[in-house]
Amino acid sequence: MKSIILSLLLLATSIISVAQKAGWKKACDNPEFLHRSIKEVTDVIVHDIYSPPVASRIYAYTTVAAYEAAHFSDSKYISLAGQLHGLSALPAPTAGKPYCYSLAAVNALLLVAKSMIISEDKIAAFQAGILLEFKAAGMPDEVYDSSLAYGKLVAGSIIAWAAKDHYKETRSLSKYPVGNDTTSWKPTPPAYIKAIEPHWDKLRPFLIDSAQQFKPLPPTTFSADKGSQFYKEAKAVMDAGLSLTPE
């Protein structure tokens, strides 16, 4: 009798173990893994105090990396290669190998993020923790290893693509010259921040041919005359600032 009970217990344990391992796919396909990874990138962007244009560049390349590593999970989605300027064909998954594309996407996103921010250690610490969560879900070693490797391949291609967008070249260009005359823009209190990214137009665009496709109208002509359009617009801004409410 005892041997029968022991056999039943072993069988039950085996069934539970198999069921738990079979559930890893559902657990690992949870979009929260990707959402949390992007949130971590946001937190580091804020910590490192990147300007909005530079932050937008980080978001663009990291999310393209995640998409490119994940889109093979659904045949309805296609690669952005050939659609975004300068992005050529990316590595494809090896036929016959098992993958968790959610893990591949998270790994690709975080690897690209580490290449673009100052606080690499913060991203690395988060990455180590979230990869352990994938592993703890019961993902088979073969799937785990192949998914990490594929995410790394995609990340490498995206990092190489990003390196050619002329961002690095703009780091050594001259700052925006601030004029002394009354018509010139000047940094304002309280931070007196310098003009942000005056050479951003020199970066490779993602989709449009150039900024000329959406050329804005020229700014209102400066004038201190109280009847001028410039004076009216400037006063409207001042009045709005003076009448702000807590909301």
Where do the language-model regions lie?
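Acidic/polar surface patches and capping/hinge elements
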Residues: 20-247
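Bacterial Sec-dependent N-terminal signal peptides
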Residues: 1-24
